[in-house]
Amino acid sequence: MPMNRRTFLGKSCASLGALAILDAAALRAQSAAEEGSMADWTGRHLNEGNWSADAIFLSAIKFLKQPEDIVRVSMPFGGGMGQKDLCGYLTGGFMAIGLFAGPKKASDNAARKKCSQLAKEYYDWWTKNYPLHCGEINKSQTEPCDYKLMGQKTAAFLQALFERESNKG
């Protein structure tokens, strides 16, 4: 059955509108499935096989609603850069702070200063709670380290930091 242009465009727009509504409903359902805290997400990411740096950074990416594929930059930092060196939770947290507060332009000195302040606050918190290097973590404790709990505590600290700074607005 032949259709004139106006009828065709009307039906096309109606179909696209219905698809947009269905897509929005799917997006809301996906968001509901992703609800939770950075600590919850970090635990899930660890259970899925992620290492420290990518687990903490991926949780921050989700919290900050950024594209998840950027997590790839954190992969080499897990396991203390694969050498039991600087802990991946520490380095992943620094990447998360950069994503949250880092300057979008090199000339943004205010953002650079804020990012540095948050990084210092995180570093100070970290060094009060954990050694810097993965190889020292079990040696410094009387009981074996619970890496998942350590990651969740780190994620909770970062989320509180992000929420506090976001509320300053």
What residue spans do the PLM features occupy?
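N-terminal secretory signal peptides and thylakoid transit peptides that target proteins
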Residues: 1-17
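C-terminal segment of N-terminal export signals and the immediately downstream linker at the start
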Residues: 24-45
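Conserved active-site and cofactor/substrate-binding residues in soluble primary-metabolism enzymes
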Residues: 37, 51, 55, 68, ...
